[in-house]
Amino acid sequence: MHFIFIILSLSFVVNADVFPSSVTLSSNDFDTIIKWDNNVISYDVELMQYSHDEWRTVCTNSLGYCNLTNSDIDNDDETWVRFKYENKTSNEHNIGRVCEIVQITSPIVNMTRDGSIILLDIHHPMTYDNQYYIYNNITLCGFEFIYEATFIINDTIIPYSIDNQYCDDVHCLFYFISQEPVCVYVMGMEQYYEFGPKKTDNSTRVCVDGLIPRKIDTYFIKDFDDIDRVNNRLYRVVSDKYESNISSKFMHLYNNILSSFKLILQELMVNTEQ
């Protein structure tokens, strides 16, 4: 009798512990993984998202974790998982949204000097496989970072926010003038995401040497490349800040003015070089 009781008790314990009790969701640059606490039994893993309302198998015979990276999930959707083992199905586990928990690595930063003009080039963070930029991409949560730059000039720390008017879907180009040695590191910040602020890691620190010898600069446009840079800057400021409030006729006129401005500058520079 005691032997039968022991067998029944052991059977109850095995059934009670057959499924994980703790399930977590992690994502690094959208390499997204579910992990659980039972690493003894292999499970089939099923997933359901709020907008689809149906269960589908995302992993089979998985031990300890299930990689969702190639499972075509909606990163901004509430998500549930459950486990299957033999003919049994676990309770459902709400694991939240990828957009809430994703950790994003640092932007790639380069800085170059051309005389007194310094170019800070900030490349947006990319997905774990270097396939997609994590910036203004609706399938990757739509994060639109403002880059918080920390400049170090002559041992003085100067914080500066790089507005997204300097940015496109690949990188941000920020020009400024300094003859001093300059170092900088950058962090991306999404202030207005609905589930709270989202930060990237800090970038590596990059530097440019000071200008030797020092000189007096009295003008900003020095060669043909500068003309395109100034034109692009003017166009981006106007289109980003005002395009939604002005007519297409005005934008057409504005583009004509920019083109004329470029032709005038080119003519002046050609005459100056002769």
From Swiss-Prot:
Family (UniProt): Belongs to the type II cytokine receptor family.
Disulfide bonds: none
Any one of the GO BP annotations: type II interferon-mediated signaling pathway
Example of a GO MF term: cytokine receptor activity
Domain of life: Viruses
Name of the protein in question: Uncharacterized protein C6
Pfam families per UniProt: IFNGR1_D2, IFNGR1_transm
